[in-house]
Regions:
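Surface-exposed beta-strand edges and their flanking turn/coil or helix-capping segments
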Residues: 17, 21, 31-35, 45, ...
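Helix-boundary and loop/linker segments of multi-pass membrane transporters
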Residues: 19-24, 53-60, 90-92
Length: 207
């Protein structure tokens, strides 16, 4: 399916293929993206704890790090944000592109726990891509996310619960409330920004 979308995109012209603009590298937005992804992971933890544990299939060594932290973010962002999101946005609009690209990104990760987390992370990455019009931003965020996940897995904490890591239920509740607040506020701001992007696309099409 992805190959078909790439083919269709090429036929329609390069304007809807992955955008790599250095102007989209906004440090504040990147920091927001990292914080939002971490908060999302904390908020989803009760749900993810009900799903099967994630197997450590990454391996170790330099090649594993390059594959997980460099190659995977690069190729996956080109495919899911650069091709799938852009193609869907051109035909069905901002919201459909945002949701569809995130859903497919989650589905292709297959494992239920990884798929749910990937869908949520995909929503953040999809928004950042449309907000910055640059894959560099999403590649960096994707690499940070994969790097954290890889480090957790190779150190034996890939399936550890936050409450076990902090060692205090009170501290866990405080962290969870903070993460939930960040998730709610950031999610609301993201939806408002997506509505503006939708309006901009509509005005551009009408011009």
């Amino acid at each position: 399916m992805v190959g078909f979308l790439f083919y269709r995109s090429r036929r329609r012209g390069p304007k809807i293929i992955a955008h790599f603009s250095s102007r989209g590298l906004n440090p504040v937005l990147l920091l927001w993206g990292v914080v939002f992804m971490l908060a999302t992971s904390v908020v989803l933890e009760p749900l993810l704890s009900l799903l099967p544990e994630v197997p450590n299939a990454y391996g170790r060594g330099a090649w594993a790090i390059v594959t997980v932290v460099v190659m995977a973010p690069l190729f996956e962002e080109v495919i899911f944000r650069g091709v799938l999101l852009e193609s869907t946005r051109a035909k069905y609009g901002v919201m459909a592109a945002w949701l569809v690209s995130s859903a497919v990104f989650g589905i292709v990760h297959v494992h239920p726990t990884v798929a749910v987390n990937a869908f949520a992370i995909g929503l953040v990455l999809g928004f950042v891509y449309m907000r910055t019009d640059s894959l560099w931003s999403t590649i960096i965020l994707h690499a940070v996310n994969n790097g954290i996940a890889y480090l957790a897995l190779v150190t034996g904490h890939g399936n550890a619960m936050l409450i076990d890591l902090v060692g205090s239920r009170t501290l866990y509740v405080l962290i969870y409330i903070g993460a939930l607040a960040v998730f709610a506020v950031s999610g609301y701001m993201m939806l408002l920004a997506l509505r503006r992007l939708k309006a901009e696309d509509k005005n551009r099409a009408a011009a």
